[in-house]
């Protein structure tokens, strides 16, 4: 189904990542053996995606692939239909041979907010936890990261990632593994670790922060982005049921409380670098994600609240270091 051999070969040559081979192949074999109702249809479409047909690739200012000679209308429409097979597209946007994949999230806005604050990624190894379809990994490569490893257990996100990678000519600097953070050993291997949009899905947020720290080299940097509420260092919201129609959500600290949490598990130089209310321009339904989105999740009479009566989504970005 999926061939991870290139990644195995890559980490076999890396003395820091090599021990991962003790557990990773069996985990990925188990994942592939698990049934998924849509996987055959998606793989059939993936096989029809043309390989490496982009003359120009821009990962610095966007994720854009183009040819010097544009595709004819029939070829472009065929490619668009294949890519639509992988609906819904949640993270992006991507522009592929004049096809604009207008995703639910303007993930480029988040990237623009965090980029000025992080250590430059040039020649760094990066782990992106809960990476979705890998949009931000391509932007990391645009900043000259040496290696980007993303983890996310979703079948559809892996298919979308492999479709874009195939169009780029199978770039081997980025790899998406269908795993959760709890399946990773303590690698202590990555220069930068990103966790964006994950913390509020964890029953034990402090354990998640420790798991992230255990993936970093000494002196490595964590980039943490999550939903927050207003308040002091003691403020935390724990929704009784849903939040903005999301299930499986647990803890929404204030940014100041989150800073205390990070320090309590051993991070240093913790900084709150951005707080931003999520707008319906940043998250909304599109032709590439036709399900309900943020506009339907807010109180129709008061956009400062969710339909459950909680504060409307606000996200914070914090930067922290693992001690040397």
From Swiss-Prot:
Its EC number is 2.5.1.-. GO terms for molecular function: transferase activity, transferring alkyl or aryl (other than methyl) groups. Carboxy-S-adenosyl-L-methionine binds at residues 91, 105, 110, 130, 152-154, 181-182, 196, 200, 315. Keywords: Transferase, tRNA processing. Pfam families: Methyltransf_9 (PF08003). InterPro entries: CmoB (IPR010017), Mo5U34_MeTrfas-like (IPR027555), SAM-dependent_MTases_sf (IPR029063). PANTHER family: TRANS-ACONITATE 2-METHYLTRANSFERASE-RELATED (PTHR43861). Homotetramer. Catalyzes carboxymethyl transfer from carboxy-S-adenosyl-L-methionine (Cx-SAM) to 5-hydroxyuridine (ho5U) to form 5-carboxymethoxyuridine (cmo5U) at position 34 in tRNAs. HAMAP family: tRNA_carboxymethyltr_CmoB (MF_01590). This is tRNA U34 carboxymethyltransferase. It comes from Aliivibrio fischeri (strain ATCC 700601 / ES114) (Vibrio fischeri). The gene is cmoB.
């Amino acid at each position: 189904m999926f061939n991870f051999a290139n990644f195995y070969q890559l980490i076999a040559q890396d003395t820091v990542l090599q021990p991962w081979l003790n557990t990773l192949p069996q985990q990925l074999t188990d994942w592939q053996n698990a049934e998924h109702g849509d996987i055959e249809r998606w793989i059939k479409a993936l096989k029809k995606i043309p390989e490496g047909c982009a003359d120009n690739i821009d990962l610095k200012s966007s994720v854009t692939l183009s040819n010097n000679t544009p595709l004819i209308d029939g070829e472009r429409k065929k490619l668009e239909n294949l890519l639509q097979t992988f609906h819904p597209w949640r993270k992006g946007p991507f522009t592929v041979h004049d096809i604009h994949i207008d995703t639910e999230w303007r993930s480029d806005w988040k990237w623009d907010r965090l980029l000025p604050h992080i250590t430059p990624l040039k020649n760094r190894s990066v782990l992106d936890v809960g990476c979705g379809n890998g949009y931000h990994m391509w932007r990391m490569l645009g900043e000259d990261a040496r290696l980007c490893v993303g983890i996310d257990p979703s079948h559809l996100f892996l298919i979308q990632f492999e479709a874009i990678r195939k169009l780029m000519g199978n770039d081997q600097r980025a790899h998406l593994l269908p795993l959760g953070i709890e399946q990773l050993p303590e690698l202590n291997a990555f220069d930068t670790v990103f966790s964006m949009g994950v913390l509020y899905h964890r029953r034990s947020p402090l354990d998640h922060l420790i798991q992230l720290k255990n993936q970093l080299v000494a002196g490595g940097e964590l980039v943490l982005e999550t939903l927050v509420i207003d308040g002091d260092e003691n403020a935390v919201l724990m929704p009784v049921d849903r939040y903005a129609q999301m299930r499986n959500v647990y803890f929404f600290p204030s940014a100041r409380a989150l800073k205390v949490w990070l320090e309590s598990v051993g991070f240093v130089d913790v900084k709150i670098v951005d707080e931003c209310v999520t707008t319906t321009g940043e998250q909304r339904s599109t032709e590439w994600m036709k399900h309900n989105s943020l506009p339907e999740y807010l109180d129709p009479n008061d956009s400062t609240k969710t339909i459950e009566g909680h504060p409307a989504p606000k996200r914070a970005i914090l930067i922290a270091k693992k001690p040397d």
